[in-house]
């Protein structure tokens, strides 16, 4: 019999599947409430870790187009709906599962592709988005800082050359005046000689 609470639960789980870029199905048999709270804190705000009913989750998964979970929905089930960094969340889940053997990672979905437990572990082994962005920023920053150093070195070299050539530049007008006087002196002497004649 379908009740409004079941319809609402299916709608919520379906919505969680659709809004997430990844989801991981776990069995949590034997975990305490305190351990579940610790796991939720480790997963962060971008991941919703929900204890779910298997039959309702199967309906929601089908409505959301997530077929990977159907044969794995057995026993006490919780699903991590990941809306943020899937790598970081998968790492938090796998680290917690290593420390707490009661949490068993069964299967997952990442960007529409089904993952088995080994696939979730492989996802967790990837570098986090923040680390990847930091590496890209470092690669992009390196040529810019190298170019800045080259430009600064050229500027210093030009200043040094400009500083050394400044006295020469000041001497140049004086030399030009002396040369002009030398040219003018014979011309004046020739003019004076023609006037005398």
From Swiss-Prot:
Residues 162-197 are annotated as: Disordered. One of its GO terms (biological process) is translation. GO terms for cellular component: large ribosomal subunit. Keywords: Ribonucleoprotein, Ribosomal protein, RNA-binding, rRNA-binding. The keyword Ribonucleoprotein applies. Pfam families: Ribosomal_L10. NCBIfam families: PRK00099.1-1. Residues 163-197 have a biased composition (Low complexity). InterPro entries: Ribosomal_uL10, Ribosomal_uL10-like_sf, Ribosomal_uL10_bac, Ribosomal_uL10_bac_type, Ribosomal_uL10_CS_bac. Forms part of the ribosomal stalk, playing a central role in the interaction of the ribosome with GTP-bound translation factors. It comes from Paenarthrobacter aurescens (strain TC1). Belongs to the universal ribosomal protein uL10 family. Part of the ribosomal stalk of the 50S ribosomal subunit. The N-terminus interacts with L11 and the large rRNA to form the base of the stalk. The C-terminus forms an elongated spine to which L12 dimers bind in a sequential fashion forming a multimeric L10(L12)X complex. This is Large ribosomal subunit protein uL10. The gene is rplJ. The keyword Coiled coil does not apply. GO terms for molecular function: large ribosomal subunit rRNA binding; structural constituent of ribosome.
């Amino acid at each position: 019999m379908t009740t409004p609470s079941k319809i609402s639960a299916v709608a919520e789980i379906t919505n969680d599947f659709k809004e997430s870029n990844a989801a991981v199905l776990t069995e949590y048999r034997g975990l305490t409430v305190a351990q579940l709270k610790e796991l939720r804190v480790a997963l962060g705000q971008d991941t919703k870790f929900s204890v779910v009913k298997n039959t309702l989750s199967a309906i929601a998964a089908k409505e959301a187009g997530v077929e990977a979970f159907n044969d794995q929905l057995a026993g006490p089930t919780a699903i991590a709906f990941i809306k943020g960094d899937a790598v970081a969340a998968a790492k938090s889940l796998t680290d917690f599962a290593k420390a707490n053997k009661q949490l068993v990672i069964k299967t997952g979905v990442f960007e529409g592709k089904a993952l088995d437990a080994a696939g979730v572990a492989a996802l967790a082994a990837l570098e986090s988005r923040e680390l990847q962005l930091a590496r890209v920023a470092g690669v992009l920053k390196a040529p810019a800082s190298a170019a800045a150093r080259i430009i600064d070195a050229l500027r210093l070299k030009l200043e040094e050359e400009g500083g050394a050539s400044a006295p020469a530049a000041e001497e140049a007008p004086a030399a030009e005046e002396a040369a002009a006087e030398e040219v003018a002196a014979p011309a004046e002497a020739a003019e004076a000689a023609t006037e005398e004649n």
